[in-house]
């Protein structure tokens, strides 16, 4: 049986509260470019706001002026969204904690071995992550290629998780292959 081959994420749509809250958070805090707004064609009581998270793809938000923010945490059950992660530069990552603190937004920071992560919630309890890789992907190589290679190196070494040495070795191997160099 043939599979259906996807080519990436097209968009992610969230249920938000009202327009102003969505604009304040997605554009005001996260700096996403507001693209346009139109009625939600599936529900005449909602508007549909479109934002660019920085890579040309779409984050969209359904809003309704009668809804108010509800920061209650979302259930972490099977079939529910755990969180959405957005890529940020190293320079931005170093400023995130201070900027969230200035707005009174609680957060938690984690070192994930191959990336640094900061987690916080939107005004409606959706958990978000701002992530920054600990490597710069070489030209002609994808982030996923570096991570898969680093994981193979980690496993061969019997290490618990990917660390910066595994990343450095993976990048060296991938660039050697890309450039046709011999060791």
What are these regions (language model features)?
Residues 45, 67-72:
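A short, acidic/glycine-rich surface segment
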Residues 7, 16-20, 77-79, 83-127, ...:
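Vicinal oxygen chelate
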Residues 58-61, 129-130:
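Short glycine-/small-residue motifs
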Residues 15-59:
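Core segments of cupin and vicinal oxygen chelate
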Residues 143-153:
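Low-complexity, intrinsically disordered terminal/linker segments enriched in charged
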Residues 54-58, 66-67, 91-93:
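Short, charged/polar surface micro-motifs in flexible loops or helix N-caps
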Residues 1-14:
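Short, extreme N-terminal leader segments that mark the start of a protein/domain
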């Amino acid at each position: 049986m043939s599979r259906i081959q996807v080519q990436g994420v097209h968009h992610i749509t969230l249920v938000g509260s009202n327009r102003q809250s969505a604009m304040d958070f997605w554009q005001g805090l996260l700096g996403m470019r507001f693209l346009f707004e139109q009625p939600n064609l599936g529900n005449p009581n909602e508007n549909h706001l479109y934002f660019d998270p920085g890579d040309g793809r779409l984050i969209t938000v359904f809003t309704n002026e009668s809804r108010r923010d509800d920061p209650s945490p979302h259930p972490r059950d099977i079939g529910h969204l755990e969180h959405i992660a957005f890529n940020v530069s190293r320079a931005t990552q170093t400023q995130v904690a201070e900027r969230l603190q200035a707005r009174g937004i609680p957060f938690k920071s984690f070192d994930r071995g191959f990336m640094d992560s900061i987690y916080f919630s939107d005004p409606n309890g959706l958990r978000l992550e701002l992530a920054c890789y600990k490597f710069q992907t070489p030209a002609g190589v994808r982030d996923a290629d570096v991570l898969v290679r680093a994981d193979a190196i980690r496993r061969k070494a019997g290490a618990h998780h990917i660390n910066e040495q595994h990343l450095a070795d993976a990048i060296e191997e991938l660039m050697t292959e890309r450039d046709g160099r011999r060791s």
